[in-house]
Curated annotation (Swiss-Prot):
Gene3D superfamilies: Trafficking protein particle complex subunit 3. This is Trafficking protein particle complex subunit 33. Keywords: Acetylation, Autophagy, Endoplasmic reticulum, ER-Golgi transport, Golgi apparatus, Transport. InterPro entries: NO_sig/Golgi_transp_ligand-bd (IPR024096), TRAPP_component (IPR007194), TRAPPC6/Trs33 (IPR037992). One of its GO terms (biological process) is macroautophagy. It holds the Pfam family TRAPP. The modification N-acetylserine is found at residue 2. Part of the multisubunit TRAPP (transport protein particle) I complex composed of BET3, BET5, TRS20, TRS23, TRS31 and TRS33. Part of the multisubunit TRAPP (transport protein particle) II complex composed of BET3, BET5, TRS20, TRS23, TRS31, TRS33, TRS65, TRS85, TRS120 and TRS130. Part of the multisubunit TRAPP (transport protein particle) III complex composed of BET3, BET5, TRS20, TRS23, TRS31, TRS33 and TRS85. Residues 1-27 are annotated as: Disordered. One of its GO terms (cellular component) is TRAPPII protein complex. It is found in: Golgi apparatus, cis-Golgi network; Endoplasmic reticulum; Preautophagosomal structure.
Length: 268
């Protein structure tokens, strides 16, 4: 995909009356930084995010098949994940089975809990790595001395709701709720990657269950951002669930919103 840049970058603009404050200069510099970032097609980007789910299932399917076909006497040392991945190398002229994405998603829905959890963990890890990289992009690349750990946790969650979400999904979180004791609910009534999924308002639980894996990447993103700011995996619990959308919002093809429940263990 070729990247495009804003046509306005580099064009002179009229300066506001009077000298700029330090805050205004910082905002102006950050705007220039954002405009300089390469742009990609939003539709293609969301398709790429969604394809991570069947891809994760396909990898697990291949790993599982490789383990089953391997010698039953393989030692635990040779059976670790690194060796499994090495055995996945595609040799020259090797035929690869192509499975349609929707078949892999249905296969994931039918999988047992152990296999399903492996796939979901892989998706969360993808999101976690995105969160780490995004923190570096939005924070540390511009201000290495910024220490979020010294800030109020609520400000950090607002940063996720505003800056992180907008950078990844092109919109902010719609609502943030908290009890001010480490519990937060990030409510996205129009989570964009699943808006193209058409469901009836009275969608059955089975249909929603098949879509739940698509929520694991943003769960991982939240955990990754918090980890980069000093909150370890042991301190953070993050879960996602479908919720009813407010009645005053316009109807969309996907009738449910998403609630991201974040619990951060507060220091004593």
């Amino acid at each position: 995909m070729s990247s495009t840049h804003s046509n306005n970058v580099g064009h002179p603009q009229s300066s506001p009356q009077g000298p700029l404050t330090e805050q205004q200069r910082a905002q102006q510099q950050y705007q220039i930084f954002e405009n300089s970032l390469p742009k990609v097609s939003q539709s293609v980007y969301q398709m790429l995010l969604n394809e991570m789910v069947p891809l994760a299932m396909g990898i697990e399917r291949q790993i599982s098949g490789d383990v089953i076909s391997s010698d039953s006497n393989v030692t635990s040392e040779n059976g670790n994940i690194n060796n499994m991945i090495k055995r996945l190398k595609i040799e020259e002229h090797h035929t690869v089975d192509i499975i349609r994405s929707h078949n892999l998603i249905h296969e994931l829905y039918k999988a047992d809990e152990e296999e399903k959890e492996k796939v979901l963990a892989r998706l969360r890890n993808i999101g976690f790595q995105i969160g780490l990289k995004l923190s570096e992009l939005l924070i540390f690349s511009n201000n290495p001395n910024l220490k979020f750990k010294e800030m109020d946790l609520l400000l950090i969650m607002k940063f996720i709701c505003r800056d992180v979400w907008k950078q990844i999904f092109g919109k902010q979180i719609d609502n943030l709720k908290t009890n001010h004791r480490g519990t937060f609910y990030l409510l996205d009534y129009d989570y964009r990657p699943i808006q193209s999924f058409s469901l009836e308002e009275d969608a059955k639980n089975e249909e929603l269950k098949m879509i739940e894996p698509f929520l694991e990447i943003p769960v991982g993103i939240i955990r990754g951002v918090l980890s980069s700011l000093g909150y370890s995996s042991e301190e953070v619990i993050c879960l996602a669930s479908f919720i009813d959308r407010p009645t005053d919002r316009p109807k969309t093809a996907f009738p449910k919103g998403v609630s991201f429940h974040v619990q951060v263990t507060m220091p004593q």
